């Protein structure tokens, strides 16, 4: 068993798609549009086969994204080693996005940073623990 995909509603479908393409090497499928209900979406696929569905509806209610709440709180991407976390985090910061923590080693041993995407969704960027332990397997 595996998770097939995760979906999230966004206000600016194209900007979010570009964000994940630029920083996380996502490959977008064809845009789906259902004009009758004002819905559109992209499936983004990542190198390991994981997928994220970005969805937009013209009649959405966007509430503040509290960091301390129940429900899904972030998406985490493993990007390689610590140097990769540092490099990607720095690029995201230099491009004007907010870094809310790190890069740092957490109390439970993860090397990570946490950033906000264009719409304030929390994204963790982590080092692959297998690489950090000397394994060549991702």
Specify the residue positions occupied by each region the protein language model found.
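Vicinal oxygen chelate
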Residues: 2-11, 42-45, 65-138
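Core segments of cupin and vicinal oxygen chelate
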Residues: 9-51
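Short N-terminal helix-initiation segments at or just after the protein's N-terminus
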Residues: 12-25, 59-63, 89, 121-127
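A short, acidic/glycine-rich surface segment
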Residues: 29-30, 54, 59-64, 132-135
């Amino acid at each position: 068993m595996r998770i097939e995909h995760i979906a999230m509603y966004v206000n600016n479908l194209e900007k979010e798609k570009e964000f994940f393409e630029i920083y996380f090497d996502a490959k977008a499928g064809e845009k789906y549009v259902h004009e009758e209900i004002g819905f559109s979406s992209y499936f983004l696929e990542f190198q390991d086969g994981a997928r994220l569905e970005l969805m937009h509806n013209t009649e959405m209610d966007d509430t503040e994204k509290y960091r301390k709440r129940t429900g899904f709180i972030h998406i985490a991407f493993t990007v390689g080693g610590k140097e990769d976390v540092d490099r990607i985090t720095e690029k995201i910061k230099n491009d004007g996005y907010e870094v809310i923590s790190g890069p740092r080693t957490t109390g439970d041993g993860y090397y990570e940073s946490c950033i906000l995407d264009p719409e304030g969704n929390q994204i963790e960027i982590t080092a692959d623990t297998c690489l950090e332990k000397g394994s060549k397997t991702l």
